[in-house]
Amino acid sequence: MDARKNGVLITGGAGFIGKALITEMVERQIPLVSFDISDKPDSLPELSEYFNWYKFSYLESSQRIKELHEIVSRHNIKTVIHLATTMFPHESKKNIDKDCLENVYANVCFFKNLYENGCEKIIFASSGGTVYGKSDTPFSEDDALLPEISYGLSKVMTETYLRFIAKELNGKSISLRISNPYGEGQRIDGKQGVIPIFLNKISNDIPIDIIGSIESKRDYIYISDLVQAFMCSLEYEGHEDIFNIGSGESITLKKLIETIEFKLNKKAVIGFQDPIHTNANGIILDIKRAMAELGWRPTVVLDDGIDKLIKSIRCK
């Protein structure tokens, strides 16, 4: 497939990852359509013959099936990148039924409707940080899936259904198990993203509450590296359909806080620490498959990535 000749649909185009992806794809002159429940952010390129925006929620795909068919046909949509979700990880624990309905069932309907209306390939943004559980060794794509929260379980179920539907309807699918993305364009006053949240709280002397062990490790990926992983996935024609996408490195929460303290020249205020959760295990992703199959590799190390994010915030 030549992505330059076929249209690409992105859901969740107004989000952090969506905006970065759209900017890259418009620059490459790839015909592009974005679905989002919000209007197009002013920070994105102007709409054009090659960049279209629809206020359309994937939750409504069955109710608006005729409109979906017309959009897919009009823009020759052959590939869909599904970023949109209705749930943050921390919210899913108290909203299991809503999570299942909106982030499993609605996805199944959306995928089926897309394949049946001419789409050939769906790339799904899964979660490398929540589908595996925790360990002190890197997770490969073939390891057992042991999600500990509903958010991770819904990702696992969606991956499985996507693979099944693609096979049944002669389509292709890719699930990218993404670590913790961060970088330029990310809100630091939001509810998502450890690095921007820590930057905001340390900058403003707001206490940081630690849930779990402060020695637990996480994998963080800079947004430009993540965008390139999606671009490689657009062109990929191989047989693998699941890829871990991370930095290949990990850092403890304690070390991350110390790093940000040094860069801001401010001490963090540590508030609540959960004394029950003392397990220092965390999430480290083995990214060798993505490097070998997609021809992709991360290029931004964490220290430089945090510098880039801080600089972008100060330039606003």
Swiss-Prot record:
Residues annotated to bind NAD(+): F16, I17, K155
Consequence of gene disruption: Cells lacking this gene produce semirough (SR-type) LPS with only one O unit attached to the core-lipid A moiety while the wild-type strain produces normal LPS.
Activation and inhibition: Inhibited by Cu(2+), while other divalent cations such as Ca(2+), Co(2+), Fe(2+), Mn(2+) and Mg(2+) have no obvious effects on enzyme activity.
Positions in coiled-coil regions: none
Activity as a function of temperature: Optimum temperature is 15-37 degrees Celsius. Active over a broad range of temperatures, from 4 to 80 degrees Celsius.
Record's keyword terms, sorted: Carbohydrate metabolism, Lipopolysaccharide biosynthesis, NAD, NADP, Oxidoreductase
Keyword ATP-binding: no
EC number(s) recorded for this UniProt protein: 1.1.1.266
GO biological process: fucose biosynthetic process; O antigen biosynthetic process
Record field: catalytic activity: dTDP-alpha-D-fucose + NAD(+) = dTDP-4-dehydro-6-deoxy-alpha-D-glucose + NADH + H(+); dTDP-alpha-D-fucose + NADP(+) = dTDP-4-dehydro-6-deoxy-alpha-D-glucose + NADPH + H(+)
Residues the record marks as active site: Y151
Pathway note: Bacterial outer membrane biogenesis; LPS O-antigen biosynthesis
A GO term for molecular function: NADH binding
Role played: This is a step in the biosynthesis of D-fucofuranose, a component of E.coli O52 O antigen. Is more efficient using NADH than NADPH as cosubstrate.
Family according to the record: Belongs to the NAD(P)-dependent epimerase/dehydratase family.
Protein name: dTDP-4-dehydro-6-deoxyglucose reductase
Organism of derivation: Escherichia coli
Taxonomic path: Bacteria, Pseudomonadati, Pseudomonadota, Gammaproteobacteria, Enterobacterales
Gene: fcf1
